Amino acid sequence: FIQLAEQPEMRFVISNTTEAGIVFDPSCQPDDAPASSYPGKLTQLLYHRFKTFNGDKNKGLIIFPCELIFLNGHKLKETIYQYIDLWQLGEAFKTWFEEACGVYATLVDRIVPGFPRKEIDTIKDKLQYNDNLVVQAEIFHLWVIEAPQEISREFPADKAGLNVLFVPSEAPYHERKVTLLNGPHTVLSPVAFLSGINIVREACQDEVIGKYIRKVMFEELMETLNLPKAELEPVSYTHLRAHETLRHL
């Protein structure tokens, strides 16, 4: 993988190594092939690129970690600095990393149950070919990137019709997601479980429990957020529609 660093046109690194992926493992060494941790691998890649292009600041990389960690970019950057110091990669490389590269915090918001095992035969009949890479996901999607607006000109995902926002701070969107998506799940779980319902869709479609979860979302959880209701209500309705159509625990 290290040869990727030698490609002059390379510009972006996007990762999702799960919540456990951004960790500092002091046992990683600079000559590991490759390092076992993701931040270790990334530091190796960046250092090889730095040496390949003799510290050219036009060859820096823009890095978007998508791991579900609040301020994931800050955590990843902090971990890279730890490897720079541990491996004694030098002040010149550290300066290049600081000035030529950008590590930006992101927030991804989309329910992705994964491979639709129960519906795959119907899907294959519709497609008229076998596709074992089918992934089921809700229609709603949001990718918040805490980065300057000029980065959006290099990464114009919104021009492709994707709901990608470049914002000064991801914090309000993180709070919104935790409150309106994760919050209802937390409230719903014990009530549905004790009622003999294990699937979110079935709980939302239940006459009593469905009414209960709507009341919690719109009359209680939403009131705790310091954001305009005009912005919050469409998001809440979208999450509800997803819960009512996707089969997930």
Annotate each predicted stretch with a short phrase.
Residues 1-241, 247:
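Substrate/ligand-engaging "lid" and interaction regions
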